[in-house]
Structure formats: structure tokens, C-alpha cells
Design a protein with these regions (language model features):
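Cytosolic regulatory regions of ion transport systems
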Residues: 1-233
Length: 233
């Protein structure tokens, strides 16, 4: 990527497909699912969680299936101070998880370097249906790099995505971004000197998709359709 921009793979970095049956219903043909592991439930970690809860809704979730057979997005939060961090988050957003049925959130009071967590990372990385992304969000930039570059080798071997928080872009960050070997899918993020552009924050594309869906499948009021139609045009 150019110096002025960085490109990141989406969390669903393999296509999630569905097919239309003769009766008109849609059925999932992909068993793949997104699994986001957030290390460090600080302000950055909470922001990533909230954004993931907003966007990680995929077409192969089918609420017609029995509850235990539905394909859900998984989010695992790991922090050594999770109990206190979790209480703070739940006080801010007491109802957020109960309103989302297609995402499972797990809070782990643990260290990402513990034997138990490393074993779980290995298992997730080796699962052929799991699209694993590990986001290292700890404050200390040196510790963040160390954690992100020393995950179980299965994470890199199976081309899982790794995001490492860095406050500023430096030579080592650039080397990691340009790596084409073991760390090919490791990227740094969060640099304060590389702020988000205004157009990234726009939700027009989502509105367009919603407009087309409503026109095809729902009896939404004409007034709202006309408003969205003007935006689409």
C-alpha cells in the first residue's frame, strides 16, 4: 500500500456464499464463520467490539434452523483484568448483547500467553471453517508487537489475520507491513498520524443495500422508499 493509505482484509476474508432454492428460499452453502479475538479490553478493544457488533452479520446465519445449528460470528475478548473491565462495559451497554442473536461474545479473564489460550488459538487456526483474526490492542507498542509476532505458529501457517496496535508508524511497523513470508497477514493499525478519512465513516453503502432489500422483499412505506431512492440516485 502507499504511504498515505493502508489496506486491510475484511474479517470475512473468504467468500460466504448462499444459494436460492427452487422454492425461492435461500440456503447457506458455506459453513465458514468469522472469529475475532480481541486482546486487551481497553478503550481500543471496546471500540473494536462495538464496531464488530455493528457490522459482523453474515448471510449464512439462518434463524430457521435449530438454535445450536445456526452459524454465528464469534468474538472472544481476552484481558488479564477482564472482570473489572467487563463490569465497566456492561454498565455502559447493559442490553447490547441481548439484542443481537447472530453473534456470540465470550469474555476471557486470562493472559493471551497462557497455555490454555495458546491451545485455543491453535485449535481455532486449524479449524477449516474458522476465519480467525487476532487484534492485539494493548497500550504498550513494544509489548503489542511482541505479542502479535509470537502467537502460535499455526496462526501464521494457516494464514489467519493478525492486527497489531501501534500509536505511531515506525520502521519496524513498516517492515511488518511489507513482510511477505511468515508475517504476510500481519498488519499494524491504530496510528494516530494516520487518522480515518471522512468518507470511511459514511454509511451510505449500507443504506443502499437496505433500500434495495426493502424494495424487493418488504412493504415499506412509500415515503421512506422515496427518501432512500433519492440518496441512491
Amino acid at each position: 500500500a502507499a504511504d498515505s493509505e493502508r489496506y486491510y482484509d475484511p474479517l470475512d476474508y473468504r467468500p460466504i456464499s448462499i444459494t436460492q432454492q427452487p422454492d425461492g428460499n435461500w440456503t447457506a452453502t458455506s459453513q465458514d464463520y468469522v472469529h475475532l479475538v480481541i486482546v486487551g479490553f481497553n478503550r481500543m478493544g471496546r471500540s473494536l467490539l462495538l464496531e464488530a457488533l455493528r457490522i459482523c452479520h453474515y448471510a449464512n446465519y439462518d434463524d430457521r434452523l435449530p438454535t445450536d445449528e445456526r452459524i454465528r460470528t464469534h468474538i472472544t475478548l481476552v484481558d488479564r483484568e477482564m472482570e473489572s473491565q467487563k463490569d465497566y462495559f456492561k454498565a455502559q451497554f447493559p442490553y447490547i448483547e441481548s439484542q443481537i442473536g447472530d453473534i456470540e461474545v465470550e469474555y476471557c479473564h486470562d493472559d493471551i500467553c497462557s497455555t490454555a489460550m495458546r491451545t485455543r488459538l491453535q485449535q481455532w487456526a486449524q479449524n477449516k471453517h474458522c476465519m480467525l483474526t487476532v487484534a492485539i490492542c494493548v497500550h504498550d507498542p513494544d509489548l503489542s508487537l511482541s505479542l502479535g509476532l509470537n502467537l502460535p505458529h499455526e496462526v501464521y501457517q494457516h494464514q489467519c489475520r493478525v492486527l497489531i496496535r501501534q500509536d505511531f508508524n515506525n520502521d519496524l511497523s513498516s517492515i511488518v507491513d511489507d513482510e511477505q513470508g511468515r508475517y504476510r497477514y500481519v498488519k499494524v493499525f491504530g496510528m494516530v498520524d494516520r487518522g480515518m478519512k471522512k468518507n470511511i465513516l459514511q454509511d451510505k453503502l449500507a443504506l443502499y443495500v437496505n433500500y434495495l432489500y426493502d424494495c424487493c422483499y418488504t412493504d415499506e412505506s412509500l415515503k421512506q422508499k422515496e427518501v432512500l431512492k433519492k440518496m441512491y440516485e
